[in-house]
Swiss-Prot record:
Protein name according to UniProt: Cysteine--tRNA ligase
Lineage: Bacteria, Bacillati, Mycoplasmatota, Mollicutes, Mycoplasmataceae
Gene coding for it: cysS
Gene Ontology molecular function: any one: ATP binding
Keyword Metal-binding: yes
SS bonds (residue pairs): none
Catalysis: reaction(s): tRNA(Cys) + L-cysteine + ATP = L-cysteinyl-tRNA(Cys) + AMP + diphosphate
PANTHER family on file: CYSTEINE--TRNA LIGASE, CYTOPLASMIC, CYSTEINYL-TRNA SYNTHETASE
Keyword list, A-Z: Aminoacyl-tRNA synthetase, ATP-binding, Cytoplasm, Ligase, Metal-binding, Nucleotide-binding, Protein biosynthesis, Zinc
Co-factor requirement: Zn(2+)
Organism: Mycoplasma mycoides subsp. mycoides SC (strain CCUG 32753 / NCTC 10114 / PG1)
Entry similarity comment: Belongs to the class-I aminoacyl-tRNA synthetase family.
Pfam families, per database record: DALR_2, tRNA-synt_1e
Motif annotated as 'KMSKS' region, chain positions: 262-266
Amino acid sequence: MQLYNSLSKTKKTLNKKTINLYCCGPTVYNYIHIGNARPILLVDVLIRYLKSRSIKVNYLQNITDIDDKIILKALENNLNELEVSQKYTSAYLEDLKSLNINQPDKIILISQKMNEMIDFIKNLVDINAAYVLDGDVYFDIKKYENEYCKLSGYKLDELISGKRVEIDSKKHYSLDFSLWKKTDIGIKWDSVFGLGRPGWHTECVLLIDEYFNHQTIDIHVGGIDLKFPHHENERIQFIAKNNKELAHIWLHNGHLQINDEKMSKSLGNVILVRDFIKKHNKNTLRWIFLTTNYTQPLNISDDLIYQANKFFEKLTNLSKKTIQFIIKKDLKIKSINSSEYINKFNEYMEDDLNTSLVLSLIDLLIKQINKNIVDKNLDNFNLLIGSLNYILDVLGFDNVFNYKFDNKTKELFLKWQELVKNKEFNKADLIRNKLIEQGIL
């Protein structure tokens, strides 16, 4: 399988039977919005595909339950930080379920790893990769300036002149970033450096380092907005501590726009996942994300949502026609996992998750199944139905194509046909209403 690696700027081959994967999780101070959902859905589709190819995936995700934003939210609502973080952690897990996203194998709350975090930072200080100043701890970028910014592609002098970093006069170098923050505000822990809490960039790298036993992971996933400084700072800490790369492949998904505008609070166009699902459905967002390569920006327009609705409408109508055809022809449909269509699906997915071509393949299958039904053609019908069902299932679509039914439904449909044939329309209408409720007519 080939995936685009943001570090090398080339597609890289993934050919292992066990994959270690990390994806940045949410900071739990609010409900997640649809932009937050893009990398998580990307991972879900990737893992579902890898598992369909008998590849094992060890998937780790953090939940940042310690952060200035959480403290601010708590102060605004007269709550403590724990109440805020617990509320939105639960909400996040609910949203995953609502989107039919499989939970990671391991989710770790940052607050549960505070001792390990302190030890990790102390280790960086001990090897002179970081320094302590008045209770704060900073990473020493100058020691690793030949490695720093290889992921983002920035040049150090451009970052300084462009003010892409915080100005702090007490730091050795303006690009040095915080590993431990001395503070009297909000939740804090005692450490060898004094009272404070860890910096955000250390939280993720600590979990990767510990959970995957100090080894380079196969895939690191996150939004392109996190490439600098967050992922850059994760990477440099791991290199400093372990003298090796953090990840073989860095996957970054592109920005999200809403009707050609950046999604932002100031524009008032931020769409929460739960609000989107209420208005549309859980499958709509998945389809929208699959229309464009994950590395590219994606504009969610009213027209794109309309296209998504038409897609699911086609599948609903196809489900009805398929069930009717199977009953009329008394067919037995078997599940399959191999066909020319599935081979083509695998080919597209192996090429950096080319999901736009996969959606075209699904459209082709829908047209071919419809043609077979119209022509009353049984040739390859099981293969077509099985292929479509297999592909939709691997992509994670939930209950969008249904061709299965029980004997009671079959008997009801045949009875309805008989009544119509005998022109007993009043009785037929009673059964027809039941079949409509069941999604058969």
